[in-house]
């Protein structure tokens, strides 16, 4: 439980390296907010992680990471709900 009482945001957390990172952080006791390109993808990943870690706190959001105001709003909401953001994993890629 090395990450107990820590809050992490993981961009691109619904699959691949981001999902694996979320899984590891939850195993270590962190609260995890993962981002995905769609709310459906975020919800699916959250459901899978909650099934594996039923007592963990994990949430999914889908801000537009190519829009600074969308990112700011998402991070403000996360900080308001979960407190200080201790860890940020910038894993998502953005293409136009």
Regions found by a protein language model. Give the residues of each.
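A glycine-rich helix->loop->beta "capping" turn
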Residues: 52-57, 76-90, 96
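Rossmann-fold cofactor-recognition segment
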Residues: 51-67
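Conserved hydrophobic beta-strands of the Rossmann-like cofactor-binding core
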Residues: 7-10, 88-89
